[in-house]
């Protein structure tokens, strides 16, 4: 936050100003006139407007602005909090589900009452790792703790106005594994010759393909470096894809509109709240069209993710209900609290046993996108070897897949943290055309656009464009170091055991060394999921190979698409757009009429 702004200066209302692009005109109030003269004439410039309600700026408005980003987002992010979760649980009773041999279903009277809701939640593995490190338990036990809190009889269901809880708690690793397969497919298509591609070049990202799962990185790119947008992977993040999956399947199977399915996501960073507010991630993007209009119950878009809270906010949610997380049973829920998913095929896909293959140290703490791409291409090139080269710091790593003959087959990289991201962006930035008289104009720039890349799906002249894929995350150290994770000072307060955290007896501010040690503890808990999964797999089927995982994902997603009668591209892909700023433009400058009309026509704000 800049030196001019501080948290003390902010309140729950931000008045439209010169640095805000929301098209709200501020007019003087209409003052009542005591004049009784029926012949009084008022000139046009003296006509006073009607008194209008106060202007409101929503989070989606501020996401469309590169002016007062920090202050506005800091205020409006707080609208998605533990308080919203409690208010929603108290405002709506839980929709009763009746179980039979075909799975759960709703009675016709219950489905039409309009008041009840189906509550579902999704949890990221980084959240479980943070809880495991805080309470000195395993990652699997942290899973049980969350399930008991959200769905069990001693958790949220034990209190509140209606005793509502969450019918299903989903692991985002399921959709992450699916996205890993689709990411490898996407990168593979970009490396093919244009004539051999199965996907249109207009829907493919340019090389190098940049990961798009981190909302902090996406927001930064859209606002400050729009020239990298063609490089972004078109795939949704695990959070967004989980939301689309749950809203589509549950609304279809249970016969309720998507607005009756309330989806809570528990994530490691605050930027996930921004992602959930994107208009591209609502039912408008996937609803079937009726004469060009989405088939929704109202004109208001329904988010795929209704609310996002962080790991720390999960602790606050528990304390607000007077629930002590460490006292909850660390065991799986009784069958009466775990209804089957409405569709048997998708139930097997969504709640399968995890093999933990992408939570290894080699894959990293951010989902293993780069690791899976490399392993997929290595499997297609027997005898090849992955060579690693460290960068200036631990958050920059470059990889080369070398053939048995020592020739490079593909290159990839990992860039974590904004300091390193800025270096990556500089490498991708197209060369500017010289303005000097008589300067030679490159053929690719002769059309007049000085930032126009040489071609749509080929590498440009930057030194970083020889990569096929780059995993980009905003947080140094990856997603286990997200801004919403439990800090060491919070863990000291939350822990009930002196063995849980280092230096519990020392209440002073943690040193950098202690903070690094704490992050290493969280990373260790994150990686322990692999050993937990291996223990579950003992005596059972072996972990799936890469071709088996690919076939499983493609089969499940084809079934999902056919079930919903919606093209798969509308379910799994999203779009990005450049965010322009009006800051510094003169008031009499020409107005981008199209953009203003688009913004003005969206009640409650939008992208």
Swiss-Prot record:
UniProt keyword annotation of Protein transport present: no
Pfam families on file: Fe_hyd_lg_C
GO MF annotation terms: 4 iron, 4 sulfur cluster binding; iron-sulfur cluster binding; metal ion binding
Record-linked InterPro entries: Cytosolic_Fe-S_CAF, Fe_hydrogenase, Fe_hydrogenase_lsu_C
Residues binding [4Fe-4S] cluster 1: 20, 62, 65, 68
Sequence ranges of Polar residues compositional bias: 29-40, 452-461, 494-505
Residues annotated for [4Fe-4S] cluster 2 binding in this entry: 214, 269, 475, 479
Key words of the record: 4Fe-4S, Iron, Iron-sulfur, Metal-binding
Swiss-Prot/TrEMBL GO biological process terms: iron-sulfur cluster assembly
Domain of life assignment: Eukaryota
Region (Disordered) location: 28-47, 439-461, 494-513
Function comment: Component of the cytosolic Fe/S protein assembly machinery. Required for maturation of extramitochondrial Fe/S proteins. May play a role in the transfer of pre-assembled Fe/S clusters to target apoproteins.
Family note: Belongs to the NARF family.
Matching PANTHER family: NITRATE, FORMATE, IRON DEHYDROGENASE
Protein name: Cytosolic Fe-S cluster assembly factor nar1
Organism: Aspergillus oryzae (strain ATCC 42149 / RIB 40)
Gene it is expressed from: nar1
């Amino acid at each position: 936050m800049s030196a001019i702004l501080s948290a003390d200066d902010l309140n729950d209302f931000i008045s439209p100003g010169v640095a805000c692009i929301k098209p709200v005109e501020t007019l003087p109030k209409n003052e009542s006139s005591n004049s009784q003269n029926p012949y009084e004439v008022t000139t046009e410039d003296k006509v006073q407007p009607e008194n209008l309600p106060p202007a409101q700026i929503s989070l989606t408005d501020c996401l469309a602005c590169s002016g007062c980003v920090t202050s506005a987002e800091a205020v409006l992010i707080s609208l998605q909090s533990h308080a919203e979760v409690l208010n929603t649980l108290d405002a709506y009773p839980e929709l009763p589900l009746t179980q039979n041999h075909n799975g759960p279903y709703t009675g016709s009277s219950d489905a039409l009452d309009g008041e009840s809701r189906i509550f579902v939640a999704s949890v990221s593995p980084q959240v479980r790792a943070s809880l495991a490190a805080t309470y000195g338990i395993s990652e699997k036990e942290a899973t049980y703790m969350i399930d008991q809190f959200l769905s069990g009889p001693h958790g949220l269901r034990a209190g509140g106005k209606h005793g509502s809880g969450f019918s299903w708690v989903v692991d985002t690793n399921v959709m992450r594994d699916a996205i890993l397969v689709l990411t490898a497919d996407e990168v593979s298509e970009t490396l093919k010759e244009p004539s051999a591609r199965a996907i249109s070049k207009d829907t493919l990202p340019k090389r190098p393909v940049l990961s798009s799962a981190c909302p902090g990185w996406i927001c930064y790119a859209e606002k400050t470096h729009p020239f990298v947008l063609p490089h972004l992977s078109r795939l949704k993040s695990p959070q967004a894809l989980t939301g689309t999956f749950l809203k589509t399947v549950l609304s279809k199977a249970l016969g309720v509109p998507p607005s009756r399915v309330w989806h809570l996501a528990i994530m490691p960073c605050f930027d996930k709240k921004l992602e959930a507010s994107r208009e591209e991630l609502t039912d408008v993007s996937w609803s079937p069209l009726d004469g060009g209009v989405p088939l929704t119950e109202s004109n208001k878009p329904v988010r795929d993710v209704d609310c996002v809270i962080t790991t720390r906010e999960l602790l606050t949610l528990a304390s607000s209900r007077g629930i002590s997380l460490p006292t909850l049973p660390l065991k799986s829920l009784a069958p009466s609290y775990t209804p089957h998913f409405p569709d048997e095929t998708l139930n097997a896909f969504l709640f399968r046993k995890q093999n933990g293959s992408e939570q290894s140290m080699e894959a990293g703490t951010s989902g293993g996108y780069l690791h899976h791409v490399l392993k997929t291409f290595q499997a297609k090139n027997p005898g090849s070897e992955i060579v690693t080269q460290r960068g200036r710091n631990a958050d920059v790593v470059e990889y080369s897949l070398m053939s048995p003959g020592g020739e490079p087959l593909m290159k990839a990289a990992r860039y974590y943290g904004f300091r390193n991201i800025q270096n990556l962006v500089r490498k991708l930035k197209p060369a500017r055309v010289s303005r000097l008289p008589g300067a030679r104009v490159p053929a690719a720039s002769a059309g007049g656009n000085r930032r126009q890349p040489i071609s749509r799906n080929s590498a440009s002249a930057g030194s970083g464009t020889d990569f096929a894929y780059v995993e980009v995350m905003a947080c140094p150290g990856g997603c286990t170091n997200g801004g919403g994770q439990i800090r060491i000072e919070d863990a000291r307060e939350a822990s009930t055991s002196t063995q849980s955290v280092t230096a519990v007896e020392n209440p002073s501010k943690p040193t950098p060394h202690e903070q690094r040690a704490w992050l290493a503890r969280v990373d260790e808990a994150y990686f322990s999921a692999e050993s937990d999964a291996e223990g579950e797999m003992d005596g059972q089927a072996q972990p799936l190979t890469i071709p088996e995982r690919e076939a499983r994902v493609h089969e499940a997603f084809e079934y999902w698409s056919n079930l919903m009668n919606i093209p798969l591209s509308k379910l799994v892909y999203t779009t990005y757009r450049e965010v322009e700023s009006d800051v510094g433009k003169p008031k009499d400058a020409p107005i981008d009429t199209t953009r203003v009309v688009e913004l003005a026509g969206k009640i409650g704000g939008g992208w």
